[in-house]
Amino acid sequence: MRVVFVCTGNTCRSPMAEAIFRFYAKESGVKADVSSYGLFINPDECETRGQALIAVRKLNIPIRKKKSKVITEDVVKNADYVVTMTKKQKDALPYDNVFTFSELVGGGDIPDPYGLDQNAYDVTAFRL
């Protein structure tokens, strides 16, 4: 199963979701190829933010800093599931295999913690 997580810049939410999903899939014995991408990349912010790494590690889940990547049509077409953090992001990827996080687990859009304090990142990681 190929699962792709998408957020705005691939620096906060989608890398956290990737690490968390990978951890729990492995713990459950589910074979999954998990990755994450952004709709856009800011050249000044092109890797996983430190606050995101800290938030996921607080959950005792391993996560590594990664270089941000932009989602492509090929990535979407080759995935079984593409999971966006917001409806607006889903609307930017008009394919049948694209779902919002809330469509799959409920709870509404996942707000972007970018630019906020560590607590915002911790709350985001916990929700994911």
Where are these regions (language model features)?
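Hydrophobic structural packing positions in well-ordered secondary structure
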Residues: 7-10, 83, 128
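Phosphate-binding/catalytic loops
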Residues: 81, 87-127
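Conserved active-site segments centered on acidic
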Residues: 1-77
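Short, surface-exposed, polar/charged, turn-prone segments marking secondary-structure boundaries
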Residues: 32-34, 61-64, 108-112, 126-128
